[in-house]
Amino acid sequence: MRSFINFVLLFNFAEAFYKVTMIQDKTLHGCSFQNTSETTIGNCLAKCLQNCTCRAFRMCGEDKTCSLCLSTSTSLKIKEKQGDCGYFAFERNHQHGYENGGKSGCFQDTNCCLTSQTCFNDGVCKPSYPNDILHSPRFTCDCPPGYRGNRCKQPIKSCRGYVKASGHDPPASGNYTIMDHDNKPFQVFCNFVKMSVSDTTVSWTLIQSYRFENKTEFKAPFFNDNPKNAEDPNWESYRLSLSRMKSIQKDSSKWRMTCRFDTDGLNKTDYMEGLKSQVDILTYNASDCMNVEFINVRGYECAVGNCQAFLIQKFNRPFHHDSYRSGKKKCSNSHTGNKCSADNSGNNGEDNFGRYQDGCVNPDHRCSKNKVSTTQTWLGA
């Protein structure tokens, strides 16, 4: 059986009218209850208004003890419950004030941001005053760089944390703050790509970039820690520490290699992309034909379904692709690259996306076109 009680309360501290509705033998799902010592509806409402996460309240037992319904979800659900508790919802009721000669300038809503700790990690609380409080949060948090969530509790571990749900326009590419494994902030470069087919955004976090003229500084495999200017994302000489790469990779599912991204943007001539589940570039220690999602070298390409590339990474060699051995070993991406002119054994060939050994370089490959050409490695999801 339902019983409805509607009335208006005027609080001196708020100068705002609220209509409170009671429904007997109901319970709220989607909130946690916080007990108080209040035993009157008015005092319970006042207590609730001071807490931004309070969306309703209940009073139970013979002494009518007040409990606050705390929730940050979009909407709460009312369900049947047998017992001695009454659930109370409230909403603003300015109409009552107007009927009694009030003016719009006289009404001041309670700023719960001043009376409760709502946002974390230095997030800025902004009160909101929805008419339907039960189905709309009473606050928003402006999160500082590196955090997200409705209360700024979630550290952003990769560029993926800055992407909103499907259908939204992607963020602008550029430098963003993310958090490492110790929740320490650092800057990275993010590239966001809107996928037209799925209407989703893929985010890419840059972990390494260098000019061809700086190739000797980037001979270490990814499983060795060899940071370069790790606090200053740049295209000429940059590499994150291994620990930060691992932290980003935990929030990633794929990787890619690009050429001259700083000048040409995303160009899929001389481009390679793979899945972490098939090739983990942070642990890969071999030289073999490996599955990739896509590879294009000088216009020759293959895509997902039947696509392999000869990938090399060892303790004395950085991660890269050998297009000569890809053809020699009959990988599915078997276009023939040049053999190294300085290699008497004939086993090594054209380096793509890294290493660039003297005599193993093809200037038609965009990454090694000239001394200022750049090579990038990214982790994405």
Please provide the spans of the model-predicted regions.
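Extracellular disulfide-rich cysteine clusters
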Residues: 2-113, 117, 128-140, 144-146
